Every structure is written in C-alpha cells, then in structure tokens.
C-alpha cells in the first residue's frame, strides 16, 4: 500500500508559491551592521574618488555648466571665489556620480532578505528613482535653464550690461538641477503610496484641483529664478509627472 502524507506543505505543486527569500541565510545583528559599515565605506570612498576626478576636470565641467548662459561674462568678486566655487561644483558632481553606486550598494544589502514579491516592487523603484533624478537634471539643463537665462538676460539688456558673479550663477544652476531632479521623483512617491494602500489612483484623480494649486506653488519654490516662463514650465512638468504616476497606478490596478 502506497501512503502519501496529506500534510506536506512543500509539494512539487505548491513549492513555487511559497514566498521566501532566495538567500535565506541567517545573519546576526553584528554581521548585518558589519556589512552595512563596509558598504557605507565603499560609497564614501567612491564619493571621494568621484569628487577628486571632478575637481581635476573642473574646467570642462564649468564650461558645460556655463554653456546655457550665452553671451554672459562672469566675474570673480572676491579672492578665492572661483576656487571655493570649484570645490562646491566638484562635490555636487561627486554626489551625482555616487548616487547610482549608492543605490547599487543598497540593492546588494537588502537583496538577500527580500521575498520574490518584494523584489518585483522595491528593485524597480530604486532603479527608476535614479533614472528619474538623472532625467530631471537633463530636463533642467536643456529646457529650464535656457528658458530662465534667456528671460533674465533679455530683460533690461538695453539698460544694463549683464556681468554675473561666478559663485552666484553656479549656485543658481546647481540648485535648479537638484530641485528639478527631486521633483521628478513624484511618480516614485505615488507608487509607494499606491502600493502600500495609503492612497489609490482614484483618490489621486479626485484631488486634481488641489494638485494644480500645489504644482503652481512648487513651480515657484523649486525654480531659483523668479521669471514666469521657468515657473510655468516647472509647474507643467510637475503636473505631467503626477498624472503619469496615476497612469502607472491604473495599469497596476492600484
């Protein structure tokens, strides 16, 4: 007589449906902290390396950042202004260059403890957040910066000659790139809220009137310039990102 156990939960039929981490190897808290320390050190060393390389190539980077300001002469208004501004630019470049590597280290750290379902959600979100941030920076450089600078240069150009401070210009352009990159993270926030069940896509659609007001305010806050053209472009981009996030949630049926 062939007897088959009736309480075997891990049969060939249902083993594929068991949601457990693929690398389910127990680690002590000390081991977790040691791994976290090592990966943090890797990220810091990569940041130092990227910042150093950026500083050695600062003339090329400065030329790229100056490109949107066509016809503008930059002045050094204080001793060492160019030097300290160069350090600031190199640090910003180091942060941007390190971000993908930092996300990669985060993925390696959390990957062993994730279930198959969690991997399908978290890993694409992490990768998408980096891509969206880079896309936001590119959008700011090729769209927002030229629009803002064209307005600021042309306004009153027949009365005053535009001579700009090197440091103030780079504060302006770097803040514009950073704020736009952060604004492009809106769909990621929406996905997190939708997947967690905090807000549904239908609730986000019903809030469209408030979102228009918020987008207008965000356009004024996130753009370092006060010209209406740049603020309008930024507000429109925020709205498109918001409704794009809703479309993704609708596809996911959230």
Swiss-Prot record:
GO BP terms, alphabetized: intracellular protein transmembrane transport; protein transport by the Tat complex
Keywords (A to Z) from UniProt: Chloroplast, Membrane, Plastid, Transmembrane, Transmembrane helix
UniProt membrane topology term: Multi-pass membrane protein
Subcellular location: Plastid, Chloroplast membrane
Protein name in the entry: Uncharacterized tatC-like protein ycf43
Listed InterPro entries: Sec-indep_translocase_CS, TatC
GO molecular function: proton motive force dependent protein transmembrane transporter activity
GO cellular component: a single term: TAT protein transport complex
Top-level taxon in the UniProt lineage: Eukaryota
Classification via PROSITE patterns: TATC
Regions that span the bilayer: 41-61, 64-84, 91-111, 125-145, 146-166, 172-192, 204-224, 232-252
Gene behind this protein: ycf43
Family statement: Belongs to the TatC family.
